[in-house]
Amino acid sequence: SALKDDPSHTAEVLAAAVESGGYEGLFLDLAELSSAQKKDFTALAEALRAELGEDRLLYLMVEAPVWQGAAYNGYDYAALSEPADKLVVRVADYGDVSEDFPIAPLAPLEEVYYALAELADQVDSDCLSLLLTTTGSAWTDGRHTGQASAAEIEQLLSASQTKDYYTDRYACAYLT
């Protein structure tokens, strides 16, 4: 809905909320945008910079360019980096399995590398930040049963019956 309204009006409303809340800036996360929304998101980012002024921070979450899997093409990275203080790049979570067993980390290193390589010529590196998950993926009897938080993983690591494994093939750690 943030992209359906006039970008100036949306920016005005968001900047007023930042001001009245006494916040240092705004972190805007509009996930999985399509190519049809690219210009609208860029216009909103530019309007937000104008409304927030230079004394407030503007962080924009963007989906990473992908090597494999579904791509969300609603981000003009170069144009978005102009009004943004930071572009926070989200690498999609993956759940690759083989014979009902997870075989890849949630943020595969090759996807992280690809995304950063693609953005290197488009965005100043000082403007880029990378978002990686700190959760784990829980599996029971070959079925994905949910997520495990960082605190839950730490608790599992301290349990004497927990065994940890690492596979070089998939650059991924496992607990059983």
Language-model features: where?
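Gly/Pro-rich active-site loop or hairpin
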Residues: 98-119, 174-176
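Active-site glycine- and acidic-residue-rich loops that bind
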Residues: 64-71, 108-112, 135-140, 146
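Short alpha-helical interface patches
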Residues: 77-83, 111-115, 151-165
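A sequence-level detector of short, solvent-exposed, charge-rich linear segments
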Residues: 33, 99, 103-107, 127, ...
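Chitinase-like catalytic core of GlcNAc-active glycosidases
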Residues: 1-108
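Active-site region of glycoside hydrolase catalytic domains
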Residues: 95, 114-141
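Glycan-binding loop/region signatures in secreted carbohydrate-active enzymes
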Residues: 1, 134-176
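Structural alpha-beta junctions
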Residues: 52-56, 121-128, 158-163
